[in-house]
Amino acid sequence: MKDFLQKITTEGKAMYLAYDHGFEHGPADLPGKSIDPNYILNIAVEGGYNAVILQKGLAEKYYTGTKYQKQVPLILKINGKANIWQGGDIYSYQNCSVQYAKQLGASAVGYTIYLGSAHDGKMFADFGRIVEEAHKLNMAAIAWVYPRGEFVKDETSKEITAYAARIGLELGADMVKIKYSGSRENFEYAVKAAGKTKVVLSGGPKVSDEEFLQIMRDVIAAGAIGVAVGRNVWQHPEPLEITRKIREIIFS
């Protein structure tokens, strides 16, 4: 099977700078300089990230055809939702085609699946099609799999996190992005469940440096290939310094 992740990994490891938060969480998650996409893209370049993760509007206006396109690969997030609606089950609609992502210069596409939502079957079908379309265009397909819904009692439990990882494998994802499940042992179970689909950690909300770096040590020891980190870098007062510490853990 072809390695579609080659353009966005280094010797099988990966460090991605995620910046799809403006869509998903709103400007409240983008304090200070982080509201400026150029600030984020400069961190991605100077920090040596394997890719930056953007929604299509940011890619159109700040990445495609700019100096950044030659300096850091792009993972285009092709679905999303706002966080204002708090009721009922979630369905995250696709807002960009795989073909258009390719035109924007993306090396990979990302798609969120809410495992446990009443609409997860639609998202499974969407992502299955997206994988096929991406591979035809020599692009990687990455699944963000987040357990949500009435019947999900603990979205970061050992079993449900492993189930999220397994969904990525079953749907043909090249990589699956999942949340931390509380310990190295628990995360190792998720990595095993993912089989030949590579696993990266979802960086999550801003926490202390010590806590985040320990989580990074746990997941790399468990077999994850890296992280897609956002707030713990660009909300940090010294984003390049915390990047250096993350890099040491992943690539040492």
Predicted regions located by residue number:
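Alpha/beta enzyme core
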Residues: 14-52, 56-83, 87-199, 210-225, ...
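Thr-Gly-centered strand-to-loop micro-motif
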Residues: 201-203, 229
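A C-terminal functional module that forms or caps the active site or interfaces directly
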Residues: 206
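Short acidic/histidine-rich active-site segments
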Residues: 227-234
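Short glycine/proline-enriched turn or capping motifs at secondary-structure junctions
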Residues: 235-240
